Amino acid sequence: RQQQIALGGEAMAQGRAAKLLRPGAREADVATVAAGMRRLRRDGYLAAAWMLAHDDIHCWLADYRGRLSVWCGEQDAITQPELAQGVALRYGAPYIAIPQAGHASYLDNEIFFNQQLLRIGEEVRDECTN
């Protein structure tokens, strides 16, 4: 990760932006991801990358008592869908595969992603009013 960030935001954006999306992603979506990568700050990026590589999500989820669902793009090359499914199974949570989507599923399939957000909002609203 340090090598990636040492090359600079522009080089990282050029080399990695498309990998966060599904194969054949829209150029506008690749440009959106690349623009975000160009704005990354070295220390923040390295801290986040370290946490993702070294922290154990199970330590956090073992004590979690709230509602949980696991979402993953069907074509995610960063977080493998099989591993996301395993997390859902382990914690008895629903697994939602986001069709035609990579890691940045909110860009690849924004309609499906937003429908899921709206569904959750309705569930929470219904809980609060019943």
Annotate the PLM regions.
Residues 63-64, 70-72, 76:
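Short beta-strand/loop motif that positions the catalytic acidic residue
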Residues 91-130:
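Catalytic active-site module of serine/aspartate enzymes centered on a nucleophile-bearing elbow/loop
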Residues 16, 49-52, 87, 113-117, ...:
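Hydrophobic "lid"/C-terminal helical patch
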Residues 64, 90-91:
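Short, structured coil segments at secondary-structure junctions
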